[in-house]
Every structure is written in C-alpha cells, then in structure tokens.
Amino acid sequence: MKKILGLTAILFALSSTTFAQENEGHEKVKVPTSVKNANMQKYPESKKQHITWETEKGNYEANWGGRDGEANSVTYTPAGTFVEIVKAIPVKELPASASSYIKTHYKKAKFGDVGRVLDAKGVTSYEVEINGKDVIFDKDGNFVKTEM
C-alpha cells in the first residue's frame, strides 16, 4: 500500500511539472485567438510542438522547435498579421561576406543565436546575436545595422 501511495505521489508530481511547463509563457502572455489561429494556419507543423509565447515591441512571438525551443521564432501583430519568421541556422550557413564582416568587426566576440529571417514581403536577411546585440545582414551578407 505504501508503494502504491508513493508511486501515485511521484506520478502526480511529474504530471504537475509537465503541465506547468506546457503552460509556461501562457501565464505571462495572453495571446489573442486571432494570433494563435494565424500561426496554426501558416505553420501547421507547429501544432505538434510545444509553443512558448512572448511579446516584443507590441507584437506576439511564437517560439518552438530545436533544443532550446526557439528553432523557429514567428512574429505577428495583435491582429494576427504575419511580420516575420526567424529560423535558427548554423554559423556556417551565413553568407561569406557576413562571416567576413563579423571576423573583421567582432574579433573575440561572444556569439549567440544565428538566424535566417523571412519577412512578410518575402525578403530574406540574417541576424546574428553578438555580445547581446543583433547584427543584421541582407540576403547577400552585407551589413545593414545593429539593434539593441
């Protein structure tokens, strides 16, 4: 009997932890239905993933996939209009000119995330997190700007 009660307690604890993790991000951010629906319509594969939501500059950002849960990061307006998707990529997939720029201007820099960005107009760019800032490059790897 003690074993059954012990197992029940352990299973309850594990299921509570799992439930809390599934709702992580939703407790702090109330995502409009229009935004959730837009994400499911545009990226139906995300339905099978654990999605975390956050707000950024008045918009909503859905994150899912990969080890850190942020292999895909999609931004929508509050009305559910697609703004952009950032897909995590390895550094070696950056255009050569972007890599060259980074080596020249950010010697011994600490790299963070590297992503390929596709915006609502179909324009591709790249962003590289370096020393806590986003360094933006165009589709050819030419430096565009640095964002905080």
Annotated model-derived regions:
Residues M1-N23:
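Bacterial Sec-dependent N-terminal signal peptides
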Residues E22-M148:
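Interaction-mediating elements
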